[in-house]
Amino acid sequence: MGKIVQQCAAVVLNIALVALCMHMAAAATTTQPGHICHLPGFDQALRCIDVPVPLDYQHAADGNLNLHVTLAPALREAARPDPVFVLAGGPGQAGSDILPLLESGFRKLRATRDIVFIDQRGTGLSGKLDCDSTREVDDLDEAGQVQLIGTCMKSLNKPFRFYNTENSARDLELVRKALGYAQVNLWGGSYGTRLAQAYARLFPAAVRAMVLDGVAAPDQVIFAWGRDAQASLDATFGQCAADPGCSKAYPNLARQFAALLARVNGGEIGLDFYHPRTARRIQMRLAPARFLQTVRTVLYSADNANRLPFLIDSADKGNWNPFVAQMYSTSDFSLEGPALGLMLAVTCAEDIPRITPAMVADEERNSFLAGQEVKLVPKLCRSIDVPAIPASEPGMIAAPALLLSGALDPVTPPHRAESAARHMAHAQQFVVANAGHIVSQSGCAPRLLREFIDRPDQPLAADCLKDIPRNGFQLGAAGPHP
């Protein structure tokens, strides 16, 4: 009986693969531009397209950039005419960096719609603005970071002033036209939600609906996220204290963390380890920036945050190996680091000019991050010298919008989505209690994404998000149970 089932399953799989290949072949012989391609992070054939866009929209004849677009065609032959445009985060992350979402968050959507991943100008395969030399810049002190990044930006020799959110939004419109779509749906994650909102305001007739996951509010200043990070850390410590196993294993967690942070800031932590990916021996003094960014990044994922008490306790007892392994790990769904040049081009023009002395003082007083980034990044901005883009009053967005937030998110928590929703005529907002940054791939969320995109004008029944559990805390080297 089992053998018959296996044979039947193989037949069904072969039929599905043949259908997909026929669909791809049909697409290749019609009006779709580009070519069949295979990219890291997804093992099926995709379609890669280069779309030329003006470097400077004010002087479009002066030269173009090539924008890389990755199209995953709908799996069913009778596809809906409106695709989903995927806008990655950062700023600096590329659409092609998050292709694994095709098998998680977008697996339901792709049944009936093309999924279009766009590498924003200056990211990924769209002329990534980055240098290999900056990969481990957080290991340096502030003066070293400023010098290294300044050298990198000078070597890139790019007109950074043209790499901003508005130009990227205009690029999306040219992609829509090049691919022949009358209207599109948008999925934006983190900074991608800022880009999605900008596009929806500039080209309202082109946007059918949008899903914003990890919502950046119009008034949010990137790098001034100290209070949000502190709230996430406090929530993690609070959940540990309320958990019998975690509180027993780590009864003095907050005190341990404070003592560890003081030692790191005092330059007392020397590390001697083998790099987890290269096996190269490294001897270094742990820089405060590296320590702080590792803790903040761990908080992005609820599962990783469940490891944080173990990491802190191990380090406090002299075993830094678990922390080092986490320090060099990659994100769950991104294959590459962000383009540092693009991140600076956007934030130095759009965010850093909005930082005030009062904001810096607040960051210093009210977060374990102690204002490190809001004090450092303005110095990095001198290396690219982009003009400030004045903040404008956000207009109302007419397209139906689904706003998703993780209650434990250290960078775009639910109150950011609430602020953004005030400028949307038809917004539905949901919070996942046991989640951090980006929730589209969690629990029933993939199904809800499709239900919303299919019927964006209808109320979404999303009670299933309450059923997404939080996994247990790591209580020892073996996992949740010591």
Regions found by a protein language model. Give the residues of each.
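N-terminal secretory signal peptides that target proteins for export/translocation
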Residues: 1-8
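Short helix-capping/linker segments at secondary-structure and domain boundaries
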Residues: 299-313, 353-358, 457
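Bacterial N-terminal signal peptides
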Residues: 11-23
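Gly/Pro-rich cap/lid or specificity-loop segments adjacent to the active site
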Residues: 29-290, 345-482
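Structural motif
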Residues: 275-293, 300-304, 333-341
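Non-catalytic, charge-rich alpha-helical accessory subdomains
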Residues: 308, 312-324
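Bacterial Sec-dependent signal peptides at the C-terminal "C-region" and cleavage site
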Residues: 20-32
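Long, low-complexity segments enriched in small/aliphatic residues
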Residues: 319-354
